[in-house]
Amino acid sequence: MSTETKNYITPAGWQALKDELYQLVNKERPEIVQIVNWAAGNGDRSENGDYLYGKRRMREIDRRIRFLTKRLEAAVVVDPELREATDQVFFGATVGLLRGDGREQTVKIVGIDEIDTAQNKISWISPLARCLIKAREGDEVVLNTPEGREEIEILSVEYIKID
């Protein structure tokens, strides 16, 4: 994601990123620093597994902390519950669909840091979300897939809390 692209995120997604950052900064990193300091005092570092693993884990944690910090700084929190009622699909919508194969599906359009296919949370920049954005309840949209074109009917559009 380029720096010009907004990082839209729901309040629940924002909180999840903040919670992960807090956990890394205040719990995991201090524990690893303690292990590395202890292991460093045990002599030869070149064959010291605790030291080598600890340093590697600390780099991973630091990398994740930098990533989360940047994502939170670029975040634009959008609360779907505060959106005026509309039958048009935008970020934060919970959308009922009738897929081309006759299956009904409900998807929630969320930020890229919140994707969870097990809970039908799809990114607002995913191909499915992109073809749904700005469409209205009752509209049919076309999703181009590697297998071909799929016609999808929008059955419902709601703006409710997304956990």
UniProtKB/Swiss-Prot annotation:
Matching entries from Pfam families are given as:
GreA_GreB, GreA_GreB_N
Q: Which cysteine pairs are covalently linked by disulfides here?
A: none
Keyword check for DNA-binding, yes or no.
yes
Write one Gene Ontology MF term. Answer: RNA polymerase binding
PROSITE patterns attached here? GREAB_1
Lineage: superkingdom: Bacteria
Q: Which family does it belong to?
A: Belongs to the GreA/GreB family. GreB subfamily.
Q: What role does this protein play?
A: Necessary for efficient RNA polymerase transcription elongation past template-encoded arresting sites. The arresting sites in DNA have the property of trapping a certain fraction of elongating RNA polymerases that pass through, resulting in locked ternary complexes. Cleavage of the nascent transcript by cleavage factors such as GreA or GreB allows the resumption of elongation from the new 3'terminus. GreB releases sequences of up to 9 nucleotides in length.
The record's annotation in HAMAP family points to: GreA_GreB, GreB
Q: What is this protein called?
A: Transcription elongation factor GreB
Q: Which gene encodes it?
A: greB
